[in-house]
């Protein structure tokens, strides 16, 4: 089994190249998104048994996220649906040179509220999207979850892709280095972060 945790959001993509999110234009979406959700959805599509931990608002965006994950075979039983909070969102615009700019609306949304329950008893692969380390509730649970995974005979893999829009404090950098070193899969990246 492969498990992950982190932000569950929907994404809106500008239909206009080079708008830079600075002017009124049209967008496509909402697309189910968030690095952990994108990863786990793809893992499920290629046949892995998968599960994700995270939170959504009790709204249409959250419903579309859950439906997409469920339809693709992801175990969503431990996704919390939170009353009084909305599902997180992101807006993205692409540029002619293929770069992109993001605006995330995660702070104050359900995407910030990640709790862990019903962890598998059998060994599992824990996938960590480093973009999620910017979220307090993920960061607070992460090292304990890594220890549990290793003690339980599991493995850890990391996506070292960290969005500058989500990285803030030196604490985030320290946790990233620890997680990358624990995983053993991205030691070169961890050395570069120092």
Where in this protein do the model-derived segments appear?
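Short, basic and Ser/Thr-rich N-terminal targeting/leader segments
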Residues: 46, 85-88
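Structural motif
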Residues: 53-56, 79-82, 129
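Short beta-strand scaffold segments in enzyme catalytic cores
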Residues: 89-93
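Alpha-helix N-cap/helix-start capping motif
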Residues: 37, 59, 85, 108, ...
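Conserved beta-strand edge residues that scaffold enzyme active sites
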Residues: 57-58, 83, 163-164
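A glycine-rich helix N-cap at a beta->alpha junction
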Residues: 67-85, 95
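Glycine-rich phosphate/adenosyl-contacting loop at the front of the ribokinase-like
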Residues: 1-74
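Ribokinase/PfkB-type carbohydrate-kinase core domain
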Residues: 1-5, 70, 76, 99-194
